[in-house]
């Protein structure tokens, strides 16, 4: 399907505000405790992350679940019935979301080589590490991550959030509820549920016998509350309410 694009829009004139942007903020992950959760700063984003859903995820992973929630356990059996699955904190699930948002830009857009290299390094760092910073040569940042490129990068992340809000909550009407991406050695699935977005990362192994790729039983997953991303999204203003998109009482999360 043909899509509208601003690929060849000329960059706006550099203003006082854009000159003062902290380009190094994309290479720093600042996490601070807050009341009931955490505050995360990355790029020009400030995320307020509640500790929502952690207790529920751990309860669903236990064997003491009310009958009404068994359907949820069965649907996500590779998460809740799998002894090799691990629950991660919401701020780590958010970090994975941001890494995927950058990877989506890297894979789908015709970026200039130097800028693409920076986007690649940032996405790999967010997806594969938990460190608070990554060192990128100031020369590279100065040449390839200009103020205008920085704004394009941040806008791309917001566009990815917008794409996530077009998903429907897991449903029985055949409407899309997940975004999936396969990277080197791992598959990431982002699924919209009642409470927000369920993020899972599964390792992809190669069978020694035949060289075919198979999904490993080892999986990490976490939940990002909807409100964390909604304040950075421009979706759903004035749109009609679609209950399939917003709520499904058949799932527990």
Swiss-Prot record:
Q: Is Calcium one of the keywords?
A: no
**Top-level taxonomy:** Viruses, Riboviria, Orthornavirae, Negarnaviricota, Haploviricotina
Matches recorded under InterPro entries: Filo_VP24
Write out the annotated subcellular location: Virion membrane; Host cell membrane; Host endomembrane system
Keyword Membrane applies: yes
Question: How does the entry describe its membrane topology?
Answer: Peripheral membrane protein
Summary of the function given for this chain in its UniProt record: May act as a minor matrix protein that plays a role in assembly of viral nucleocapsid and virion budding. Unlike Ebola VP24, mVP24 has no measurable impact of host dendritic cell function.
* Self-association and partners: Monomer or homotetramer (Potential). Interacts with nucleoprotein.
Q: What's the protein called, per UniProt?
A: Membrane-associated protein VP24
Q: What are the record keywords, sorted?
A: Host cell membrane, Host membrane, Membrane, Viral matrix protein, Virion
One GO MF term on file is: structural constituent of virion
Q: Biological process GO terms, please?
A: viral process
Tell me where on the tree of life, at the top rank, the source sits.
Answer: Viruses
**What's in the GO CC field?**
host cell endomembrane system; host cell plasma membrane; membrane; virion membrane
Q: Enumerate the Pfam families for this protein.
A: Filo_VP24
Q: Which family does it belong to?
A: Belongs to the filoviridae membrane-associated protein VP24 family.
């Amino acid at each position: 399907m043909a899509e509208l694009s601003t690929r060849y829009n000329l960059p706006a004139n550099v203003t006082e505000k854009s000159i003062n942007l902290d380009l190094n903020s994309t290479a720093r992950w600042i996490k601070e405790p807050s009341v009931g959760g955490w505050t995360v700063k990355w790029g020009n984003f400030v995320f307020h992350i509640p500790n929502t859903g952690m207790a529920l995820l751990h309860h669903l992973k236990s064997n003491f679940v009310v009958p009404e929630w068994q359907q949820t356990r069965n649907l996500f059996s590779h998460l809740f019935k799998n002894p090799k699955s691990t629950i991660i904190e919401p701020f780590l699930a958010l970090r994975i979301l941001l890494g995927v948002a950058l990877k989506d830009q890297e894979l789908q857009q015709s970026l200039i080589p130097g800028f693409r290299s920076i986007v690649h390094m940032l996405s790999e760092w967010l997806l594969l590490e938990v460190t608070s910073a990554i060192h990128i040569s100031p020369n590279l940042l100065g040449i390839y991550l200009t103020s205008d490129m920085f704004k394009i990068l941040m806008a791309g992340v917001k566009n990815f959030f917008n794409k996530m809000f077009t998903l429907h909550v897991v449903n029985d009407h055949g409407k899309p509820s997940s975004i999936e991406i396969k990277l080197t050695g791992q598959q990431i699935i982002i699924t919209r549920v009642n409470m927000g977005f369920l993020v899972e990362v599964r390792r992809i192994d190669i069978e020694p016998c035949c060289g075919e790729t198979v999904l490993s039983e080892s999986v990490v997953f976490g939940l990002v509350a909807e409100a964390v991303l909604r304040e950075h999204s421009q979706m759903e203003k004035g749109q009609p309410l679609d209950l399939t998109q917003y709520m499904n009482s058949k799932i527990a999360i």
